[in-house]
């Protein structure tokens, strides 16, 4: 007879925010046993953070993660697992040896053009400079950007950064890649304008561990779902699967590979107390190979970090090769056509095998953390809870 401990009511593949939200809700709200399987040696997906050993400074291993949302339900939900600091994210942009206030606003415009502009004067200036190209006539990303903010600002702050991000001349990128380039006609340089913002007081990993702390949740690290599903599913034949890994990988790339961008990081401990005076500095010029530098001490000024050492991380962007970590969907027309075929496969997999697909990788969408959590709460409410509680048949939500 199958021992009770081996039986589960739900399998969750991946322990990022989507997977952990599903696991936590199903375990605590429905009193169900959940097994979370994680390929990596740690919990939390790309939100994982750890203390750098020499300094104790918390480093976001997969690039800076800033929590912000205007969704009250998400904010109330996440505060069950962590308190938040009052951190407000601000970014600066390095161009030609000068650091500019970012995003584009009165601070940047006044700095860049060498004198103060009132909101009205700045609007007029940018309208005049953008008049060079009509947005409707823009044939590529470069022309579209110039039609929105004018050539001087485009060449200083968009051209090089975009070329580095996409490894492609902006003249070769489709105009549709950008819908808007917002300019704020105020001195407000908060990066996000959401109602709620902050960083988890004890760090991301503590928050993620708290989400998985319920005794009805088991997390197995260093475990690839595709290696163990043949053993696990027969022992719990009624248990659905929530899969948050790459959508194309699930189907063994049968239709081809979806395109992603990846990031490379260089972490360095420097023998100084402060390297750049701010958490994130964008490097907008093409002659600098990285896109930005993170300095993690500035995320937590309330912490007692060493005054003689600091940790920086240089970030580089490139197209993902087969074995790279996927970060951002490229979303070309070919990708979208491929996605439609995989979505159709996902829908039939849900119907035939009780597998649901969610999260950034599982849906081929760029999701901020709060969006992944909101999406998981919706899947729980509309699909999983009705199925596990009332026996309603599973349907891939939104497919």
Curated annotation (Swiss-Prot):
Pathway: Cell wall biogenesis; cell wall polysaccharide biosynthesis
InterPro entries: UDP-GALP_mutase, UDP-GalPyranose_mutase_C
Binding site residues for FAD: 18, 38, 46, 66, 224-225, 360, 367-369
Reactions mediated catalytically: UDP-alpha-D-galactose = UDP-alpha-D-galactofuranose
Binding residues annotated for UDP-alpha-D-galactose, in chain numbering: 157, 162, 166, 191, 282, 292, 328, 366
UniProt cofactor(s): FAD
Lineage top rank: taxon: Bacteria
Catalytic class of the enzyme: isomerase
Cysteines paired by S-S bonds: none
One annotated GO biological process: Actinobacterium-type cell wall biogenesis
The keyword Transcription is assigned to this record: no
Keywords of this entry: Cell wall biogenesis/degradation, FAD, Flavoprotein, Isomerase
GO CC entries: cytosol; peptidoglycan-based cell wall; plasma membrane
Gene Ontology MF, one: flavin adenine dinucleotide binding
E.C. number: 5.4.99.9
Function noted in UniProt: Catalyzes the interconversion through a 2-keto intermediate of uridine diphosphogalactopyranose (UDP-GalP) into uridine diphosphogalactofuranose (UDP-GalF) which is a key building block for cell wall construction in Mycobacterium tuberculosis.
Family per record: Belongs to the UDP-galactopyranose/dTDP-fucopyranose mutase family.
Assembly information from the UniProt record: Homotetramer.
Protein name in UniProt: UDP-galactopyranose mutase
């Amino acid at each position: 007879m199958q021992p009770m401990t081996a039986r589960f009511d739900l399998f969750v593949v991946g322990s990022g925010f989507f997977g952990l939200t599903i696991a936590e809700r199903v375990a605590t709200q429905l009193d169900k046993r959940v097994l979370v399987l994680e390929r990596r040696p740690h919990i939390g997906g790309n939100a994982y953070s750890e203390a750098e050993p020499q300094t104790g400074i918390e480093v976001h291993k997969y690039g800076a993660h800033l929590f912000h949302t205007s969704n009250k339900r998400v904010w109330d939900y996440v505060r069950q697992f962590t308190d938040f600091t009052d951190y407000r994210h601000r970014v600066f942009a390095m161009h030609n040896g000068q650091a500019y206030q970012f995003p584009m606003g009165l601070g940047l415009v006044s700095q860049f053009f060498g004198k103060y502009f009132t909101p009205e004067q700045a609007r007029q200036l940018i309208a005049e400079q953008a008049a060079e190209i009509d947005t409707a006539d823009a044939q590529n990303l470069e022309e579209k950007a110039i039609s929105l903010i004018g050539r001087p600002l485009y060449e200083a702050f968009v051209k090089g950064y975009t070329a580095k991000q996409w490894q492609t001349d902006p003249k070769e990128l489709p105009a549709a890649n950008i819908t808007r380039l917002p300019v704020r006609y105020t001195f407000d340089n908060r990066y996000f304008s959401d109602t709620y913002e902050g960083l988890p007081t004890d760090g991301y990993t503590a928050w993620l561990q708290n989400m998985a702390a319920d005794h009805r949740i088991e997390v197995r690290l260093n475990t690839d779902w595709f290696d163990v599903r043949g053993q696990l599913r027969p022992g719990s034949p009624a248990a659905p699967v929530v899969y948050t890994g790459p959508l194309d990988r699930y189907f063994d790339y049968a239709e081809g590979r979806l395109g992603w961008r990846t990031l490379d990081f260089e972490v360095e401990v420097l023998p100084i107390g402060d390297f750049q005076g701010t958490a994130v500095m964008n490097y907008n010029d093409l002659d600098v190979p990285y896109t930005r530098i993170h300095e993690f001490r500035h995320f937590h000024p309330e912490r007692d970090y060493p005054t003689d050492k600091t940790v920086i991380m240089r970030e580089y962007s490139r197209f993902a090769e087969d074995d790279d970590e996927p970060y951002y969907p490229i979303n070309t027309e070919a990708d979208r056509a491929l996605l439609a075929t995989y979505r159709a496969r996902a829908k039939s997999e849900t119907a035939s095998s009780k597998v649901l697909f969610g999260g950034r990788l599982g849906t081929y969408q760029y999701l901020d953390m709060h969006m992944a959590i909101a999406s998981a709460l919706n899947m729980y409410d509309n699909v999983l809870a009705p199925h596990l509680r009332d026996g309603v048949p599973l349907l891939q939500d939104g497919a």
